[in-house]
A protein has these predicted regions:
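Residue-level detector of anion-binding/catalytic polar loops
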Residues: 30-31, 56, 98, 140, ...
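Short amphipathic alpha-helices and their capping/turn segments at secondary-structure boundaries
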Residues: 41-54, 82-96, 124-132, 187-194, ...
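Active-site acidic/histidine proton-transfer and metal-coordination neighborhood
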Residues: 52, 71, 75-173
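N-terminal pre-domain/capping segments
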Residues: 1-94, 169, 197, 248
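Short, flexible active-site-adjacent loop segments at beta-strand->alpha-helix junctions, enriched
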Residues: 11, 38, 61-66, 98, ...
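Histidine-acidic metal/acid-base catalytic patches
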Residues: 1-25, 40, 96, 154-176, ...
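Conserved beta-strand positions in the central sheet of alpha/beta enzyme cores
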Residues: 33, 59-61, 101, 142, ...
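A short acidic, helix-capping loop that chelates divalent metal ions and anchors anionic groups
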Residues: 66-72, 108-114, 149-150, 183-184, ...
């Protein structure tokens, strides 16, 4: 099987989109992953530029900052996060994309503000709402665990699967990012294998968040496992300079 490849443009923020798209296309990628800040884009221009370059939008990397918290104890804060996710679903539909990434808790939130049972309940309730809205506009969602140094909430694929299994959605799956997984999974390939057909999106980066081959992650068994489970989503490069805040470049 042949993989479909995409590139996350978060490091290109501030650069003219035509340059971003041309670069991604010239390097042979099939698709591009946009940054989850709708104000950065003119959707009609994005569609034209992508068509001119022969690429599509694979996905949107949603930006879960402190005010976008699906498990916050304040209902108004949770609603703000839901509204943001709906904006991203609309954006994805406008640009003809496939998958939006959903993380229940924002980057940098390192301790709970409510009992674990409550937070789990809010995560399930609110991801369900986001997923239903996404289905209505014709796009998919992918639940992403982050490593323990970026969030306390869910750090491994099996924890994301626990949430997914309690949802009533046909357009939802799991997102596996090899950078995060290298920190919190015992074995990346095994985690992908156990997730199986529930895996619908990936981010690829080496152990230092640089390009594969620049760190110490062994990608051969990882890619073989993706083939073995017939992964049909996009293999998306997310290469970010080392920083305590992964959104610092936006």
């Amino acid at each position: 099987m042949n993989f479909k490849y995409s590139y996350n443009t978060i490091v290109y923020t501030g650069e003219d989109y035509s340059i971003q798209a041309s670069r991604v296309a010239n390097y042979g990628y099939d698709a591009i992953e946009l940054v989850g800040e709708p104000d950065l884009y003119n959707f009609k221009e994005v569609n034209k530029i992508n068509a001119d370059n022969g690429i599509v939008v694979s996905s949107i990397c949603s930006i879960f900052t402190a005010k976008r918290d699906l498990v916050h104890p304040d209902k108004s804060e949770r609603q703000n996060a839901i509204d943001y996710c709906k904006q991203i679903a609309d954006m994805l539909a406008e640009v003809g994309g496939y998958t939006m990434i959903v993380a229940p808790s924002p980057v940098g939130k390192m301790y709970p503000l409510a009992p674990a049972e409550e937070e789990q309940k809010w995560a399930i309730e609110n991801i369900q709402k986001v997923g239903e809205y996404a289905a209505d506009v014709g796009v998919n969602i992918s639940i992403e665990p982050w490593n323990r140094y970026e969030t306390y909430f869910i750090n491994r694929l099996d924890q994301a699967v626990d949430i997914l299994d309690q949802l009533n959605l046909s357009n939802a799956g799991i997102h596996g990012d090899t950078f995060h997984m290298a920190i919190d999974e015992k074995n990346i390939a095994d985690a992908y294998k156990k997730t199986g057909s529930k895996l619908n999106h990936t981010h690829m980066a080496d152990s230092n968040r640089a390009a594969p081959g620049q760190g110490h992650t062994d990608f051969i068994p990882i890619l073989q496992t993706l083939k073995d489970i017939n992964f049909s989503g996009y293999v998306t490069m997310e290469l970010i300079p080392a920083a305590s805040d992964p959104f610092a470049c936006i």
